[in-house]
Amino acid sequence: GSYWVVEHAYPSGLLGWLSIVLKRHCEVLHELTKDEWVEFGEISFNVMKALKKTLNPKKEYLSCFAETRGFEHIHFHVIPKTAAFDENLPGTHSFRYLQVSEKNAIDIAKIRELCTALKQEMSGKWR
């Protein structure tokens, strides 16, 4: 998009954990422009549909905190509740998936494969 970029979190213990990141620096939601919000809606819609087709999650979480030191920049987490999702990590507990070492993270080749599939699903859907 013009305002946002989608990337896979790494290291991550959950395949499909995506971030929708604002391209310009901003730390608070109330400073986003209407155009940025409109595009965010379009991108998040397309991301959810693409995740459904590729990973078939039963549900998705969408969150934005932007408060952890070094991560104050506006970004949204898209967390798919796939068959691999640990039901003992509901809600904000799911952030434990980001507390893994690279050694225990999802294999980068699997992430690249998923990102290629997601890109195919979403191609041509941006304004």
Give the residues covered by each predicted segment.
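HIT superfamily nucleotide-processing domains
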Residues: 1-127
